[in-house]
């Protein structure tokens, strides 16, 4: 990453943008903002979301989203017609099982092998419920769109995992599974020249079946037998995905909120990425409370107390100033509360920019309305890109 990278550089020059962070910090919104801005600058952009809520679909002018990219009507995101004609915007919602099914079909030797795997009960469970499956399929969908979709900007909203690094670890976990001794043993019963090992496997399976039941074991064995011959394709694909994310054309943007836990998770993620030689290029802190001036909390509370005293004095004198003093005092008390929240957030954010290295940093304020349409997405974008007005900086 070059010195002084900006969010404009990311949206104009990168081919892949991965928005990551803990759940509930606005990743889906930020991903949509990047895709819309890319389209407005003439890029063929697609946003991949994992959020099953229909709010993003409604924002983009769609009734729903599916696992297939759907192009959004240009009049929705470019009503003035100012964007270059090359600009296009599409969106899809990741369907983990459908993506896994497609991957199986890609590496199966024939349709018969594909159908045997898809019909297997063990496969139907692991394709949706196995830990890390959603993260890996998000990576797979990203790779598929980049390689075969014709898009020059793919923006991914990563799954809301407790630890954001699960997204990066997913391909490696799959590789470790394929290289696992038990996995290889389960593949052996179909190979006649490994009868000794096969006998050992049978003893192992009989022991396990006493715990989980024979029917479950039969499904597992049938799955691994059907999977035979596909492991190398899956292993190569996982390596290709990791290589793609390590390229300079890929960018990681960490999204956080000012909450202490979210900030710490974001900083930790940035540091771990750096250890893997994958620098974070952007850090976006979402829903920041403005400071509302320079006066400190104590000064504001003192003003509120002074006005409260004036109210009491006016009430004793039966004067007319009691009501106005009461209202103004209440406003100062509210302002002090907001100022205290802003100071607490500033404390949480202290040093986060340094921990993010040379990443571009933006603070998006707590907006007065929810992000539910393209105008609201544009409002968020003003705090990221060159057309932005003066930006809200914590403590300023």
Residue spans for each PLM region:
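C-terminal lobe/tail of nucleotide-utilizing enzymes
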Residues: 1-11, 202, 209-225, 235-396
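Short, charged/polar micro-motifs that form catalytic or ligand-binding hotspots
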Residues: 24, 129-132, 256-259, 263
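Nucleotide-state-sensitive switch-loop elements of NTP-binding domains
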Residues: 2-18, 25, 30-235, 239
């Amino acid at each position: 990453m070059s010195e002084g990278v900006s969010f404009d550089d990311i949206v104009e020059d990168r081919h892949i943008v991965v928005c990551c962070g803990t759940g509930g910090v606005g990743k889906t919104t930020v991903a949509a903002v990047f895709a819309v801005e890319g389209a407005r600058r003439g890029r063929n952009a697609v946003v991949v979301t994992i959020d099953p809520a229909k709010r993003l679909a409604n924002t983009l002018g769609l009734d729903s989203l599916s696992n297939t990219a759907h192009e959004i009507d240009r009049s929705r995101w470019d009503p003035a017609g100012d964007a270059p004609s090359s600009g296009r915007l599409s969106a899809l919602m990741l369907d983990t099982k459908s993506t896994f099914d497609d991957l199986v079909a890609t590496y199966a030797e024939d349709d018969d092998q594909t159908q045997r795997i898809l019909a297997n009960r063990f496969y139907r469970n692991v394709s949706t419920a196995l830990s890390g499956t959603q993260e890996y399929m998000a990576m797979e969908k990203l790779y598929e769109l980049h390689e075969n979709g014709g898009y020059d900007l793919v923006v991914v909203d990563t799954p809301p995992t407790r630890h954001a690094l699960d997204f990066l670890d997913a391909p490696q976990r799959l590789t470790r599974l394929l290289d696992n001794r038990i996995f290889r043993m389960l593949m052996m019963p179909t190979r006649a020249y490994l009868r000794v090992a096969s006998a050992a496997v049978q003893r192992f399976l009989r022991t396990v079946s006493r715990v989980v039941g024979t029917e479950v074991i039969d499904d597992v064995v049938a799955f691994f037998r059907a999977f035979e011959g596909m492991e190398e394709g899956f292993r190569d694909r996982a390596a290709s995905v990791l290589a793609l994310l390590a390229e300079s054309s890929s960018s990681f943007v960490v999204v956080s909120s000012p909450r202490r836990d979210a900030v710490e998770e974001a900083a930790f993620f940035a540091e771990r990425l750096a250890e893997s030689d994958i620098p974070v290029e952007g850090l976006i802190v979402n829903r920041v409370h403005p400071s509302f001036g320079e006066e400190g909390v104590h000064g504001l509370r003192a003003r509120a107390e002074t006005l409260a005293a004036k109210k009491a004095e006016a009430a004793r004198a039966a004067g007319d100033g009691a009501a106005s003093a009461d209202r103004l005092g209440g406003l100062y008390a509210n302002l002090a509360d907001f100022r205290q929240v802003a100071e607490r957030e500033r404390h949480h954010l202290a040093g986060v920019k340094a921990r993010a290295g040379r990443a571009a940093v933006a603070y998006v304020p707590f907006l007065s309305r929810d992000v539910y349409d393209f105008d609201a997405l544009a409002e968020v974008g003003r705090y990221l890109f060159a057309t932005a007005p003066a930006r809200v900086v914590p403590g300023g």
